[in-house]
């Protein structure tokens, strides 16, 4: 294993020493300044790399919003076409269960209820 020698301020040294003491009290016999320092260095390096990925564009909110809008629009168009087929189907007309005047308010109510689960304030704004 490669060796790295670093200098730290007294506060950092005391905190690492405290961690070693706690680990030894927990029964971890191989706890040492070297082991704990190595663990902290690895964790810090992981955090640093994650931050760099985010800066380089790991997640793009605008692209996500665009993708979600596109998919929701497709689903809405498909549902509209399916609803048209159901309303125009002679069997559906004969049964009376697929009257557009009844279906549309039921769909609107369902959508409002689902949205209000996550966005309860929006329901108050619409009324």
UniProtKB/Swiss-Prot annotation:
Keywords, alphabetical: Conjugation, Cytoplasm, DNA-binding, Plasmid, Transcription, Transcription regulation
Any Gene Ontology CC annotation: cytoplasm
Function of the molecule: Conjugative DNA transfer (CDT) is the unidirectional transfer of ssDNA plasmid from a donor to a recipient cell. It is the central mechanism by which antibiotic resistance and virulence factors are propagated in bacterial populations. Part of the relaxosome, which facilitates a site- and strand-specific cut in the origin of transfer by TraI, at the nic site. TraM binds to three principal regions in the oriT (transfer origin) region; 2 are required for autoregulation while the other is required for plasmid transfer. Plasmid specificity is conferred by the TraD-TraM pair.
Membership in a protein family: Belongs to the relaxosome TraM family.
Main localisation: cytoplasm
Domain of life: Bacteria
Localization in the cell: Cytoplasm
Name of protein: Relaxosome protein TraM
InterPro entries, sorted: IHF-like_DNA-bd_dom_sf, TraM_DNA-bd, TRelaxosome_TraM
Gene responsible for this protein: traM
One example GO MF annotation: DNA binding
Species of origin: Escherichia coli
NCBIfam families: PRK13713.1 (NF010267)
Assembly and interaction partners: Homotetramer. 2 homotetramers cooperatively bind to DNA although they do not contact each other; cooperativity is achieved by DNA kinking and unwinding. Part of the relaxosome, a complex composed of plasmid encoded TraI, TraM, TraY and host-encoded IHF which binds to the F plasmid origin of transfer (oriT) in a site- and sequence-specific manner. Interacts with TraD. Probably also interacts with TraY.
Cross-referenced CDD domains: Tra_M (cd14804)
């Amino acid at each position: 294993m490669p060796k790295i020698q670093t200098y730290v301020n007294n506060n950092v040294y005391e905190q690492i020493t405290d961690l070693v003491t706690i680990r030894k009290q927990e029964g971890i016999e191989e706890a040492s300044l070297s082991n704990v320092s190595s663990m902290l260095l690895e964790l810090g390096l992981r955090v640093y790399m994650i931050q760099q990925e985010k800066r380089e564009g790991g997640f793009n909110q605008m692209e996500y919003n665009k993708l979600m809008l596109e998919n929701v629009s497709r689903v809405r168009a498909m549902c509209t076409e399916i609803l048209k087929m159901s309303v125009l189907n002679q069997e559906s007309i004969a049964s009376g269960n697929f009257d557009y005047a009844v279906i549309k308010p039921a769909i609107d109510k369902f959508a409002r209820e689902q949205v209000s689960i996550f966005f309860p304030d929006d329901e108050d704004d619409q009324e």
